[in-house]
């Protein structure tokens, strides 16, 4: 029938209208007046729309085969105008199929200009919202063709126009995604087979190198608008390059992906990074891609991207260190963006990072690691990732992360630990420090739970000096609530503490209760940390200890004065194998802290004592003890005795450190106590001896011996200064301020009243000479046996020959207060006499009826 209608009068009306839009001259374009007639006819007769499309496609194919580009463009333009005008027609799905056939024939021509024309027409089609769904439409061909165009290169048929071909391919893929997402009953564009073509095509253009040969995102604008692009005239200057356009395509693709489709998109991204080695440091391209992904998807789905990256890191555990470093760096860069949505998987993700950290440490220490510096960089990247991860979390989750990190630190309770475990301690403490720097302490009891504080106190006393130093820095970070640590970390001798610019506030009641419970353990840790300070880095460790003491100054004033006196005595102890430099460093810690605390509490007498001691030390010229050298306006600098250290010449006979006989160079505990009492402080705790000694071992299992012979075990329990054994670190309750009352002694306790030992055996004086004599005395077993038999015989004879009542009376007569009943009777008598004296001169109280005596005749 079509062949018979060869003459114009015999053609159907819709064909005559289609033929009329073509001009007679080749140079003329589409006849718009006739195009309006065709459009009106198509709208008025929707049943003819499908046939109009078929006829236009037939003419376009004929013109394409005859290489008539002008007629081809006219047919494409007519199809686009009809598509836009008849978007609500019931015949639009059938017309759309004809339109897609036309686009397909143009793309199959392998002509760059025709492909560009087809892409523009397809983008126009993708912006049409169809009122009725399409049940059989497929876009497989378009995905394949547009992906192929995205990989155009100068050696192909495109020549110098390969960038235009890439842009056309990207816009075509963008149109496919948009049309697939918006259509009802759309084909599943999120299938893995489609994403394996779309995502690599986008990333291939996004990774296009710049003029310097590397990747740079400085010229890529941030797109926040929705997808809008209809024709070539709508493409602005921001989409002139494939890199800019591919970035926008990636963001739109991720923005339209649902939670169930994320895996299909993320997996091709990870595979592309592996194949193109985009993880190699610095992974700027990978960071840009994943940041674009995180910012484009819904915020509640951000944790899924983090989890996929960690799973990919699991699968790459045997890869090169550079690859793992790149993945960890990407995690560190994007984890803060997704931090607010990771709540449900917080510990799972953090545990995965810690597991990779432990695996890296074990691999480095196994001897199989060929590139240890790269492995250390990988560990640093993981630590930074955990720190950045913590920075985006609320405070209560940061505390959970710190507790979780502490729980992974190995072998703190064992007596000996392996070298690899010590290194793991060092790495995990660095991780803990990184997380702690992101936390802002409000109340001490909130962050310093019993188990957490116990672990920190143990970490501060391990073998590794770097771990001890990092633990002190953790204390600085968590104790510092007013940003004072930066001014205290290298505190010198200040004539005026106001120059340090410290922020001082009154201690809260909650912090007072916390310090009352735990200050004993903290001061003990500081004392041992000073004793175990590394000789090779004395100044750093001394500054760290001084900073911790200064941060605790307000919360526990008297106890830290007591610690200072103990540190001074430690520096004077000749039994300790300390160098002169270490002794002088401890003396300087005491002097600097005394100077700071005296000025903070505004105690003039104590400030005068500190200045006197520091001035005497400067005059003596002992190397390392002249704290006035750093003070510009010091009156002591003009003294000839103090200038010896400045000139670098030390006279012969000048001592290298302070001895116990140099009373003028030492702080007197009685003078300090008097100064504190004058300012209204209770200084009774200063005289409680700080009797810990260093006879134990220095390591992880901590068992220490006190000077009075009582064993001290930091894991099982400890003896208090008054002789009471406490259960453990969490039960210690000692003074931290001025309102402390000493506990009742055992002799005054009611549980030891009747059967107490009144005359305890007299012990020998525990002086050094007596102990040496006792230790060097020869042991005579016969004499010891004789004395034991005599003591046993005397006790047995007393029991056999003396009655029990007589022995009880003898014991009571020695100490009447030992009898509880007699003590009560004595108190009653005394109270009765006091009442009688008080009632003298007062009128007699009337007797009650039970006290009136009857007359004698009544009997």
Swiss-Prot record:
GO cellular component terms attached to this protein's record: plasma membrane
Instruction: Report which superkingdom the organism of origin falls in.
Output: Eukaryota
- Record Gene3D superfamilies: Leucine-rich Repeat Variant
Q: Using the UniProt annotation, give all residue ranges assigned to the region (Disordered).
A: 638-657, 697-724
Instruction: Check the record and name the InterPro entries matching this protein.
Output: ARM-like (IPR011989), ARM-type_fold (IPR016024), EFR3-like_ARM (IPR049152), EFR3_Homologs (IPR051851)
State the Pfam families in the record.
EFR3_ARM (PF21052)
Q: Give the transmembrane ranges.
A: none
Q: Which GO BP terms sit in this record? A: protein localization to plasma membrane
User: Which residues lie in Basic and acidic residues bias regions?
Assistant: 704-722
Query: What family does the entry list?
Result: Belongs to the EFR3 family.
PANTHER family associated with the record? PROTEIN EFR3 HOMOLOG CMP44E
Q: What is this protein called?
A: Protein EFR3 homolog
Species for this entry: Caenorhabditis briggsae
